Amino acid sequence: MYSFQFENIVSLNDKSVLNNGCYLCVWHAHKIPPHIGLIIDGEYFSLKVKGKDTSIPLAEILKLIHRKEICTLLIEIKISVTRAQIITAFSQFSNAEAYRYSCLTPIADVFDLKQDVSMLADLLNSFKSKDQMGNVFGLNLISDFKGIPMYGIEEIEARLKALSKTL
């Protein structure tokens, strides 16, 4: 069962397309819950329990995904957003924390959807309903991958709590 199912996922043959525009990066897309970050013009941003990634060069992210064979989606977001907007949104948070902030929080802020989304499927459904989702690229996907697995807020909070115990 999926919380969001993709119609068409294509291979990323030309990584240079990620150097322009905005992409939602879904790490461990087959797991519950997945982790998300944002790519803007070839730079990566993400909020994690251990802190945050800001302005990480895309080449480093792709190298990690390839080396660890991480099941990843890169979803083109057809909304005009600037690097400055993303930096401002991420500057408000130091790290993800159970019952307060998740990796979704600053991303929802960037797109002014904080009140409307509480999980990745909500964000994806919002983009899809407004025709703001472009190409969906897949890297290291499992053979039968079709979409984001069904999960709830409880799984997100449990994962954040488990990760915070490893600090």
PLM ranges: what are they?
Residues Y2-C71:
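Glycine-rich catalytic cores of cysteine/serine-nucleophile enzymes that process amide/ester linkages
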Residues L18-G21, A84-F90:
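Catalytic-site beta-strand/loop segments enriched in glycine and acidic/polar residues
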Residues F90-L167:
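Activation targets extended, charge/polar-rich intrinsically disordered C-terminal tails
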Residues L47, D53-I56, I77-V81, Y101, ...:
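Short coil/turn linker and secondary-structure boundary residues
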Residues K68-I87:
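A structural motif
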Residues I61, I65, I77-K78, L163:
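Low-complexity, intrinsically disordered/propeptide-like segments
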Residues L58, R83, I153-I156:
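Short amphipathic alpha-helical segments that mediate assembly, nucleic-acid/protein binding
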